[in-house]
Amino acid sequence: MEHTTAFNRRHALALAAAGLLPALSRAQASWPSKAVRFVVPFAPGGSSEIVARASAQELSRLLGQSVFVDNKPGGAGNVAMAEVARADDQHTVILGHIGTLAVNPFIFDKLPYDPLKDFKPVSLLAKVPSLYLVHPDLPVKNLKEFIALARKQPGRLNYGSAGNGSAGHLAMEYLKMATETFILHVPYRGTGPQLTDLLAGRLDAASVGAPAVMQFIKTGKLRCIATGTTQRLPQLPDVPTVAEQGWPGFEMTQWYGMLAPSSMPQAAVDKLAAACGKAMREPAALEHLAKDAAIAVGGTPAEFAAFIATERKRWQPVIARAKIKPD
């Protein structure tokens, strides 16, 4: 004990003599010392940008430096993830997603990044409810009736998604596994073309994030037969959850969190995480997210790391069962 104490004292004195202790303290206290680049690995628009911009606005105020969103789409998010994994400026972070963290590792033979080693989880920012939808002409009013119809006519019903491995693809395959039904998958290149065909009645069903379809539900152009949330949404109080309709424990949400490169000092990560927690509780952020039925979270780095691990375990068997491969 005496030896350890003496060593620590000598070490501290050496640092102090060299002028390093004050510099280290100042470096931790002054982060961020410039604008923070918040990379979104998808094209502008959609749930990812809604979450990123809602949090960035509040983070800019809390941190005293601009936090700006930079969209870098491509390769199912792999391009941006690889770039940020190599970033060493201490002021670049990225929006982590169910796809880049819990799906891509199991559908791509090789990734240009390691989701576990190349990043430090900062905070789970928000969850975006997945809604299960049908065209109004389909003779079903709820999920139970939809599943009954699918079982009665196996292979006759179809559903669309924004592409292989997309959140909508996963949501429907997860539902198929939970309900032991077969529904034909029709992949599209993006949510837009998928919604066009669903609205036109060329598709029977789909699962889509709430922000993209709330307007169509409200106007009766699409029918929501279930939500993937654990509780009913305030925006859709008459629509029961999947769990309520006979599949207890079922939950399907798209989720978004902040990641930092593994090279970022832990002190900066912790400061950023604390700011994220505050940002996601701010009235302005809550109001922004509520308009699109998104649910604010704002957890700690440890909580986000545990959540990612749980999601990876959940989606690996779903991906294997459905034999999902990238487009």
What are these regions (language model features)?
Residues 33-35, 218, 244, 266-327:
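An extracytoplasmic/periplasmic, membrane-proximal ligand-sensing/linker region
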Residues 8, 76, 142, 187-190, ...:
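Short loop/turn segments at beta->alpha junctions
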Residues 127, 213-281, 310-313:
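C-terminal lobe and pocket-closing loops
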Residues 1-7, 11-22, 26:
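N-terminal secretory signal peptides
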Residues 86-91, 106-193, 242, 255-288:
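Hinge/capping helix and adjacent helix->loop/strand transition within the periplasmic-binding protein
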Residues 27-117, 156, 164, 181-204, ...:
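N-terminal (or domain-start) structured segment
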Residues 95-100, 104, 161, 191, ...:
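Beta->alpha turn/N-cap motifs
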